[in-house]
């Protein structure tokens, strides 16, 4: 999904499900000059999923954890000194279209995401997983 927009991945680190290690990796990514930071894994409501806590522990301002969009309800968006730090739910790895598709263009354009923006996605926030996908020429993400 990043390649479509010509994005270059300049930092990648695999972490255990340990908040301190994830926090350190996020801060390391920021120090490396990443303009967008994405975390994957550990985003559900399971007590063992620690990524939201790790993002919070960076000092990032959490805009929202949770979205009225399927797939992608467990999405987290925050800002760490102006750098977006997003917790991506597992669906971004397997679903054709998710909340990530709706928000990535805005993140790349440095268009700040607000809690109100996320709430507005509730109208049109259900991807119907059509056999032949016509997104963005469908109702998904359009309110």
Name each model feature, range by range.
Residues 1-143:
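Non-catalytic beta/alpha edge segments that cap or flank active sites
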């Amino acid at each position: 999904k990043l390649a479509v927009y010509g994005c270059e991945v300049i930092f990648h680190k695999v972490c255990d499900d340990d908040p301190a290690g994830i926090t350190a990796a996020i801060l390391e990514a920021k120090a490396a000059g990443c303009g967008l930071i994405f975390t994957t894994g550990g985003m559900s409501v399971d007590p063992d999923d620690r990524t939201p806590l790790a993002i919070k522990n960076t000092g990032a301002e959490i805009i929202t954890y949770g979205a009225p969009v399927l797939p992608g309800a467990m999405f987290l968006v925050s800002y760490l000194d102006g750098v977006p730090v997003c917790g991506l739910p597992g669906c971004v790895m397997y679903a054709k279209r998710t909340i990530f598709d709706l928000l990535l263009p805005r993140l790349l354009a440095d268009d700040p995401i607000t809690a109100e923006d996320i709430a507005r996605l509730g109208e049109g926030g259900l991807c119907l997983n059509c056999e032949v996908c016509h997104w963005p020429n469908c109702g998904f993400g359009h309110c």
